[in-house]
A protein has these predicted regions:
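Helix-start/capping segments and mature chain N-termini
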Residues: 1-74, 81-83, 89-138
Length: 138
C-alpha cells in the first residue's frame, strides 16, 4: 500500500518526497480523524513563522482539519487515536504526514499501558524449578 502525505492540500505519494528547506513543525494528536486543539497548534506556527521567517502563516483551522482527516483515511488509518505532523516551510508551503496509530484515544501518560491479555499456559517442562514455584513453596 502506498503511504501518502499532503502538500498544500494535495495528497501525494510519500515516496515523491517532502519539500526541502527550513521548516517549523507541530505534532497533532487526532481522535476519529479530527485533530485536537488545532487552533492552538496553528497559533504557535503563526507566531513562530512571524518570528523566524518574517511573515506569519495563513493556515485556516477548518481546512487543515479536513486535510488531516483525508490524509488519515487515504493511509488506511482506523478511527481512534493517531498522530500527524504539520510542517510549515519558510516559503509558506505546508505538509502533513501521518506518523502512526496510537493505542490511546486521547492524551495519555506514556508510562500507562493498556491492560495486557493474559493467557495461562504451562511451562515447557513442568518439573523444572521456576521462581513462582519457589515462592509458592515458602
Amino acid at each position: 500500500m502506498t503511504d501518502f502525505c499532503s502538500i498544500d492540500g494535495r495528497l501525494t505519494p510519500l515516496g515523491e518526497g517532502l519539500p526541502g528547506g527550513v521548516y517549523l513543525y507541530q505534532r497533532l494528536r487526532t481522535v476519529d480523524y479530527r485533530p485536537l486543539h488545532t487552533a492552538a497548534h496553528l497559533s504557535r506556527l503563526r507566531d513562530g513563522a512571524g518570528s523566524l521567517f518574517g511573515r506569519p502563516a495563513e493556515l485556516p483551522a477548518g481546512r487543515i482539519a479536513d486535510e488531516i482527516g483525508a490524509l488519515l483515511r487515504a493511509n488506511g488509518y482506523p478511527a481512534g487515536g493517531a498522530t500527524v505532523t504539520l510542517r510549515l516551510y519558510a516559503d509558506g508551503t505546508y505538509a502533513l504526514t501521518a506518523d502512526g496509530v496510537s493505542l490511546y484515544r486521547t492524551y495519555a501518560l506514556r508510562s500507562l499501558r493498556p491492560a495486557a491479555a493474559v493467557v495461562p499456559c504451562d511451562g515447557y517442562r513442568p518439573e523444572w524449578p521456576t521462581s513462582a514455584r519457589r515462592e509458592m513453596a515458602r
